[in-house]
Curated annotation (Swiss-Prot):
This is Imidazoleglycerol-phosphate dehydratase. GO terms for biological process: L-histidine biosynthetic process. CDD domains: IGPD. The lineage of its organism: Eukaryota, Fungi, Dikarya, Basidiomycota, Agaricomycotina. It catalyses: D-erythro-1-(imidazol-4-yl)glycerol 3-phosphate = 3-(imidazol-4-yl)-2-oxopropyl phosphate + H2O. Its EC number is 4.2.1.19. SUPFAM superfamilies: Ribosomal protein S5 domain 2-like (SSF54211). Pathway: Amino-acid biosynthesis; L-histidine biosynthesis; L-histidine from 5-phospho-alpha-D-ribose 1-diphosphate: step 6/9. Imidazole glycerol-phosphate dehydratase required for histidine biosynthesis. GO terms for molecular function: imidazoleglycerol-phosphate dehydratase activity. It comes from Cryptococcus neoformans var. neoformans serotype D (strain JEC21 / ATCC MYA-565). Homotrimer. Belongs to the imidazoleglycerol-phosphate dehydratase family.
Length: 202
């Protein structure tokens, strides 16, 4: 069984990012290592939840131009994570391909549906009522999720079914995504490409 591990370095005039992802943490067999430091506390919290509940190990460090705002850091971290995810998946053989999940957090309930398709698309409904959650702009939540989807080459739909607390709305969305990813990338035991086209890695 081949390892699904990948690293990405992303450097621009706005950010410097290193990201390593291991898609196959096995409880009781391998140690799940998660270390996220983006300079944005709430973003760290969301990416940590994504890795934890997605069954992944994740090392993600970023130094960005936060003296301007959170846009470049949040967007570029999501792009790097998506690139590493796509690289780790490789030829996308022997996986379920589709994943879906619901995740509650108190009064909030979110749904995520993903297709590991090489057809980047993103739809989202997260009705935030505040400008920020912690030090992350709420408008960046959907934007960074879109950035991840396009960099990873996946179709992604995320919806808040209900929720009042903005922290809970965001966190339940990330946890639903984590569980959907975990389903979609799970191995089937075969080596087939789950597509009538015969190829998914484009």
């Amino acid at each position: 069984m081949s390892e699904r591990i990948a690293s990405v370095e992303r450097t621009t005039s706005e950010t410097h990012i290193s990201c390593t992802i291991d898609l196959d943490h096995i409880p009781g067999v391998t140690e799940q290592k998660i270390n996220v430091s983006t300079g944005i506390g709430f973003l760290d919290h969301m990416f940590t939840a994504l890795a934890k509940h997605g069954g992944m190990s994740l090392q993600l460090q970023c130094k960005g131009d936060l003296h301007i705002d959170d846009h470049h850091t949040a967007e570029d971290c999501a792009l790097a994570l998506g690139e590493a995810f796509k690289k780790a998946l490789g030829e996308r053989k022997g996986i379920k391909r589709y994943g879906y999940a619901y995740a509650p957090l108190d009064e909030s309930l979110s749904r995520a549906v993903i297709d590991i398709s090489s057809r980047p698309y993103f739809m989202c409904h997260l009705p935030f009522t505040r400008e920020k959650v912690g030090d992350l702009s709420t408008e960046m939540v959907s934007h960074l999720l879109q950035s991840f989807a396009f960099a990873a080459g996946v179709t992604l739909h995320i919806d808040s079914i209900r929720g009042e607390n903005n922290h809970h709305i965001a966190e339940s969305a990330f946890k639903a995504l984590a569980l959907a990813i975990r389903m979609a990338i799970s191995r089937t035991g075969g080596d087939d490409v789950p597509s009538t086209k015969g190829v998914l890695a484009l």
